[in-house]
């Protein structure tokens, strides 16, 4: 995520510098001051490579980055900071209606058999996508690889039910903007 934010900020800096050199304002949807010095000030290197980052560095860059992420629009009425926090954490974004999740893969297609990372990812997939039998890509201890962790040790992700689906769990606001009543 750091690399994505860094690349995005460099693109924005170059885009804005060209626009200002031609006498035009920068990106119309970009906030006027994404980081200290504003968009138009010369930045010799990527901001993440500098010694200290200004306050709200990630949040400010991700607001601009959100303009380019059409696949994850912030849910209506949900706090922007909570949506961006979830986006940075890499999960828990509600699925847009009428679309399928990208990780709907058959078992064993996530990586080589000796990859611990693929074993962890497959262990987190729902049981119905793995099949009723034991994992066919589970690793044999006699081959020298680590055994696949048992699903009982992993905490299942909390899925939003129909009642909860309409509200942001962090700020207790519904997507329509009303506060939850106790």
UniProtKB/Swiss-Prot annotation:
Bias-annotated ranges (Polar residues): 42-53
Pfam families given in the database record: DUF4644
Annotated stretches, region: Disordered: 17-53, 128-159
Matches recorded under InterPro entries: DUF4644 (IPR027978)
Source superkingdom: Eukaryota
Compositional bias (Low complexity): 129-138
Protein name: Uncharacterized protein C16orf90
The species this protein was found in: Homo sapiens (Human)
Gene that produces this protein: C16orf90
């Amino acid at each position: 995520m750091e690399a994505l934010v860094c690349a995005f900020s460099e693109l924005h800096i170059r885009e804005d510098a060209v626009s200002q050199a031609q006498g035009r304002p920068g990106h119309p949807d970009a906030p006027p001051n994404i980081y200290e010095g504003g968009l138009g000030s010369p930045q010799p290197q990527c901001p993440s490579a500098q010694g200290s980052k200004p306050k709200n560095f990630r949040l400010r860059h991700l607001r601009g980055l959100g303009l380019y992420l059409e696949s994850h629009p912030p849910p209506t009425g949900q706090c922007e900071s909570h949506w961006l926090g979830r986006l940075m954490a890499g999960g828990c974004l509600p699925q847009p209606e009428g679309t399928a999740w990208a990780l709907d893969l058959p078992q064993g297609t996530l990586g080589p058999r000796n990859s611990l990372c693929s074993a962890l990812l497959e262990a987190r997939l729902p049981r119905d996508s793995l099949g009723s039998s034991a994992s066919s890509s589970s690793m044999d201890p006699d081959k020298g690889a680590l055994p696949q962790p048992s699903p009982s040790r992993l905490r299942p992700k909390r899925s939003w039910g129909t009642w909860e689906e309409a509200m942001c769990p962090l700020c207790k606001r519904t997507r329509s903007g009303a506060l939850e009543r106790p």
